[in-house]
Amino acid sequence: MLGIQTGSFRGCLKTVLTVGFLFLGLGCSPRDFLTRRLAGDLISQSEAFKLPQTFWLTTGLVSNKEFNSPESMVLQRRGWIIGTLQKCPVGLEPPPCWDVELSPLGVTAIRPLIGSETQRGPFGIEVAQRTLEGITGISKAGNFADVEFMWHWAPLNQVGAALYDGGVRYRSMVALREFDDGWRVVNEETHSNQTMEDALRNAEAMAP
């Protein structure tokens, strides 16, 4: 008789525990627990992270500073743009100035990326996209967390490949905050946490 009662008790206890864990599971969503996988998903899906890098190409009359900028020098070395020395108009400095246009090679490489517009520019060209490499650390304090992650630029075309070295890795740290529906990337400034835009702007380049 005692054995039957003990078996019944164990069966009831198992049922109660099963039901309890079921209700506990229903009350928690995957976003309630900040894992590295969830942090990576939140970062890679954020609008700031997904925003492609746009390079602005200006043709026509430009200042000497703009013509000799690092990006312009890359395009010159590739033979995609050429410049003719010109006198600077009033308001455009420092001299000398340059009349910039696409070379025949540049027409082949760049023209398909900017369409058939005939104006002198500037032309916006999407050249690279961020790629998340992984989460390197999470530091939690209450309903806030600082997440450190690594990423790199993935060129979208040959202009992007010329301007961005895909082998350079960047380290950033962004704030996440826990709400009633789970964790979210912080998109507004707080007293001690970086937004996603700040995290990407302040990224630290790492040696390949």
Report each predicted region and the residues it spans.
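Sec-dependent signal peptide recognition
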Residues: 13-19
